[in-house]
C-alpha cells in the first residue's frame, strides 16, 4: 500500500515537471535523438540549470531506436556503388 502511494507521488511529480512541446525544447543534442530525421515532438524535463529533452516522435521512420530500420539502412549501404568501389579499392590495396 505504501509502495503504491509512493509510486503514485513519484509519477505525479515527474508528470508535473514534464512539459510536452513541439519546438520549445529544440537544441543540437535533442535533434540528434532522431538521427537524420527531424523531431516533431519533444518531451522536456525541466531541471535546475536547464532542460533535459528527448524526442518522442520523429518526422520520418529513420529512428535510431528502431533497430530493424537502422540495420536495414546499414545493410543497404553495402550495395551502393560508392561502397562497391571502396571495397574494390580495399581489395587492390591488399594485393600490394
UniProtKB/Swiss-Prot annotation:
GO terms for biological process: defense response to bacterium. Residues 61-96 form a propeptide. Keywords: Antibiotic, Antimicrobial, Disulfide bond, Secreted, Signal. Contains four disulfide bonds. One of its GO terms (cellular component) is extracellular region. Residues 1-20 form the signal peptide. It comes from the Eukaryota. It is found in: Secreted. Hemocytes. It holds the Pfam family Myticin-prepro. InterPro entries: Myticin_preproprotein. Bacteriolytic activity against Gram-positive bacteria M.luteus, B.megaterium and A.viridans. This is Myticin-A. It comes from Mytilus galloprovincialis.
